[in-house]
Amino acid sequence: MPSAPRGFALFAGIAPDVIRACARRAEALGYTSFWVNHPGRTDGLAALAVAARETARIDLGVGVIPLHTRGPESILQGVREHALPLDRLLLGVGSPNPGALGRVRAGVAALRAGLRTRLVVAALGPKMCELAGEVADGVLFNWLTPEHARRSADLVRAGAARAGHRPPRLYAYVRLAVGAAARERLDEEAERYAAIPAYAA
């Protein structure tokens, strides 16, 4: 029985040499995707371009670019400027703010009109899960328990069914840390997300 697809993700602000080495190694080990995030002012697309130059087959994901701080035109420009390979790109977007559903729907439509690549939507709440199932090629879960992930997956499938197409592929971040301070780093990250209202709910 074949194993499930596995991805490897890094903080986009880490040193480029680390991105290069990890991207090469992930591809050599058979990982199916290599991801970076897009935190604050750190450009995830630029970090992903570093990985793209070191690899030939592995899918390349950015998860996710917040549409309330970077609009579709800026994202399109970034993808083109960095010459990201569209056949391998997993372009992740999301929005946690009020008006998120409309912003994500419009953003996905604009990106789809401008790029022939796979679009991934970050989904947490039930309405966003259903919307992601309707409009996206992939859905990214973050900081979910297995039970919450199963319920969210059902909502994604329901959205896809209403739209009349197959469900998108599901992705999930599973965080880990190594070293003597690993537990402390994970606890700090969990506390940071717990302070975000959408996750606290």
Label each region the model flagged.
Residues 1-201:
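Active-site-adjacent structural elements that line small-molecule/cofactor binding pockets in enzymes
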